[in-house]
Amino acid sequence: MNTNIFSTHLEFSKGVASVFKVIDTIHNISKNNNFNNILTQDFIIDTILSILWEDPNENEIFSSMIEDGETITNKNLSAQTKEGLLLNSNSFGLKFKYYNNAFRSWIDNYNPTSIDDVVYRFKDVNSICENNINEFKVKNYEVTVLPIYMQIANLHLLLLRDGMIYGDAWNLYRELGFSDQDSFYNHVLDKTKFYINDCLNYYNTGLSNLKLDPNNSWIDITRYCRFMTFYILDMISICPIYDTKVYDKPINMQTLTRKVYSDPVNFIDENIPISEYEKMYNISPELFSTLFSISFYTNKSGNKFLNGHVNRHVGTDLNYNGLRETHYGNYGSNYEVESMAFDDIKAYSNNYFNNTQNNNPTSVKSIKFLITKNNDEWIYGEPDSSNIDFTRNIQGYLSNLNNESYTHSLSDMILANNDKIQINIDTPHSYSYSWIYKGIEDTNYISDKLINQIPLVKEVKLKSRHYSEISVIKGPGFTGGDLILSKVHKPANQIPAQYMKNKITIPIKTKFPAGSQDFKVRLCYASNHDIGLIRLIAGSKYITTNIQQTFNTTENNPSLIYDDFKYFNFNETLSITSSGIDELYLEFYYSYTDGNFEDFPKLSIPYTRNYSC
């Protein structure tokens, strides 16, 4: 019996690694940014420019993006086209650098005489973005070069954000042809919507084309989704926080709750529809949870190999002791068991040692996990001593991945075809791994110093009654993860015994001094009706608002677009005490009107002090 080594983790090119530096920058600066003090404004554009155009090789990041685009779309650009893209990206980069230098000179010295230069540079770089960004849409290769287009679009939106923050001080709006800040603000909203829709449409086009090509396997689909989630979906999901009227305070961003998948281990090509592979290798939409432990079951005699495993997840209610278990393969008292606990640590990479037959991998002999605690490792089974220790490198970087530089932690270990596979040493066992972004916290924290963003998939209980239904559905790409669907259907001429109601239980943990604080509450949601009301409850206190229609359709589970979602504020503040309340309840009440009604809510809780919307 031979043993080969296989590894599973999230492959990072230098282009992908740079994008996560951009995302981390936006996360960190947005959490600490004080819009009320112009002198403490962090330089988001300045930091991003240093990431994307590194010295000494300023083409390295964008060259990596082009290579990634070619790989995942199976389309190669000509050398001349690549050279043109790099020249154009450098040209855009220089324009942004000139603006950034003028901006820094003004803000460092706060000298009114330097405003003219800032406005000139702003208008110059804004003009090239408005008129020339289509240089990054190469005909028939739009999806291939989409990672570059996205980064330029993101910089443009950040530029417009600067315009919203400083435009009055610069007398900028009339210089740009707008009557006032409000008209400029509407332009910013339109541009945000355009970039999000444009990038999402190209992402979906590329994915559809891959699925239609019979030469592509599930590996190709997984790789495309992974890379383009990093390059496109994650980026468009955070663009809405650039809205300075909605997010006018520091924000605890909790947007990127979606799972991403590394390439399957021991992939078995069964020549089945892509939709069937998705069921085998991916997790269906579900409430957010954190991996608590994995138990590995090994046969007690004969050749040792992995017969089964149990994933245990904990929800966002930190006071609840129960765990959700998912079972794979063979398990029970007839097998030896080893358990790896993740209750206070994360696994950010793992390594496989497989049994092989005819040089093909079959069953798993050992797995090595790299974990965040002291840069340590945990090993299931016994790896062959002839194999070297596995260390994941970020391609193009000299440094190794470690407990500081990782970006995603392990969420699920999945045995494909679990209900059909025969577990023996010579039967190929294929495994899939999902990962979640490290910036997502294990519960919902409420601070008096931040806008507290709460994706409603970070809940623990969904409850419905009568003709109502509440569930988790797959998000449309720009939401950062899955969504909650609150839905009712009342057949004609039938009257329920009571009103129709759906309820969401939201675990919280307060992070403010003893006593109670008043919070404003904002919902971002999509709704195909205006029948009913929403109530948010904290202990004995509650606030209500009427449901407002945001789009018009009679379809069940419609394809949601960015423009379907709107922000709505509760008219009253909600009083939350620092102790004694560990849950909020969001309730949807529907009247007796006949028809189908659907709501897709998201939640944020800003502190009221110095808050305006």
Curated annotation (Swiss-Prot):
Gene Ontology CC terms: extracellular region
SUPFAM superfamilies to which the protein is assigned, alphabetical: delta-Endotoxin (insectocide), middle domain, delta-Endotoxin (insectocide), N-terminal domain, Galactose-binding domain-like
Main subcellular location of this protein, as a coarse class: secreted
Keyword terms of this UniProt record: Secreted, Sporulation, Toxin, Virulence
Keyword Secreted: yes
UniProt-listed Pfam families: Endotoxin_C, Endotoxin_M, Endotoxin_N
Recorded GO MF terms: signaling receptor binding; toxin activity
Gene Ontology process terms (BP): sporulation resulting in formation of a cellular spore; symbiont-mediated killing of host cell
Subcellular location as annotated: Secreted
Family: Belongs to the delta endotoxin family.
Function recorded in the entry: Toxin active on mosquito larvae of the species Aedes aegypti, Culex pipiens and Anopheles stephensi.
Name of the protein described by the UniProt record: Pesticidal crystal-like protein Cry16Aa
Native organism: Paraclostridium bifermentans
Name of the gene encoding the protein in the UniProt record: cry16Aa
